[in-house]
C-alpha cells in the first residue's frame, strides 16, 4: 500500500499530463492536413527571350511590352509569394495554371525560389495558341504520382480555321500512408482537366460559340471517363480553369451542365464556384465596376462522397485574395487587381485574375 502511494506521488503528475495529451495524439493520428487543389491564370507568364520559332515576341526586351529580365524576375517573385501565401504553410497538392509560355518559366518559379523545397513537378504541352501561352499542371511529388497525361485540341466544325488552346488532362494517384484496397488505389485516383477557353476579345456574343465548343469537348471527355470506369466505381474528376464565362452562361450551365450544389440534377457536374456564397471574395476578375467569376473548379459528384478515398472538404472552396494582390480602384471604387500590365503600361503587379482553390481530405 505504501509502495503504491509513493508511486502515485512520483508519477501521478506525469500520468495526468499523459491523459490530457491523449485526445490530441489520437486526433493527430486520424486527421490529415488537407490537400489543396488550386487554379490560377498567371497573366502572360513569358520569359524575356526572343523565340525565333514564334511570330509573337511582344514580351521581350525589344518587344512592345519591353519585357526585361528584371521585370520577369519581379513577376516570378510576385507569383511565388502569392503561391506560398495561398499554400498556408503546406505545399499545394495540385496547381492548374494558364498563360504559361514554356518550361523555362516553370523551372524559374518552382526550382529557383523557396518553392523548390516542396518537390514540385509539372505537365506542359506547347499548343497552337498564337501568343504561345498554354495551360500547365503543377503537382507535388509528396502527394501525387502522375499516371498519364494528354491534351485535347480545340475544334469547331463550323470554323476550322480558328485555333484555340488545348484542354490539358492528367491522371494522378494520391500517395497515402495506408494504401486503399482495390486496383491501383482506385479510390484515390484523380482525373484533372485544366482549361483556358476562348476569350471575349472579339465580343461576348461573337465568341460564345467558341466557348461552347470547348465546353462540349470537355464534357465528352468527362463522359468517356465515367462510361469506361470499372463497374460500381464513380470516377473523381476535377475540372478547373479560366472559362472566360460566368457559371450561369450557356457554355458552363447548359453545354457542360455544371450546376451549383443547390441546383443539381441527374447527370450534372457540380460547380463549386456556381454561386458566390461563402467564396470569400466578390469575384476572380473585375471588368470596370463589376466583379465576375470566370475562374472555376467543377467536379463530378463522386468527389463529394466521404465514404472512401480523397473527397472534397465541405465549405473549402475559396477565391484567394491576399491584400498585396489588390489595390485601390480610384475609378470604380473598392478594390481592383494589382496587375503586371494594363495595355502597354507596366505596373509590376501579379495578375488580372485571382486564384481559386478547394481542399481535399481523406
Predicted feature residues:
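N-terminal, active-site-proximal structural segment of metallo-dependent hydrolase catalytic domains
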Residues: 26-117, 122-133, 325, 329-334, ...
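Extracytoplasmic/periplasmic, Sec-exported soluble proteins
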Residues: 67-75, 87-89, 97-101, 126-130, ...
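Metal-dependent phosphoester-hydrolase catalytic domains
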Residues: 29, 162, 223-237, 245-362
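Active-site beta-strand/loop signature of hydrolases that rely on acidic residues for catalysis
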Residues: 37-42, 67, 72-75, 79-106, ...
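Active-site His/acidic residue clusters
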Residues: 53-56, 188-209
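Short, solvent-exposed loop/turn elements at domain surfaces
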Residues: 44-51, 201-202, 306-308
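Bacterial Sec-dependent N-terminal signal peptides
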Residues: 1-32
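Structured beta-strand-rich core segments of catalytic domains in phosphoester-bond hydrolases
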Residues: 42, 100-189, 195-197
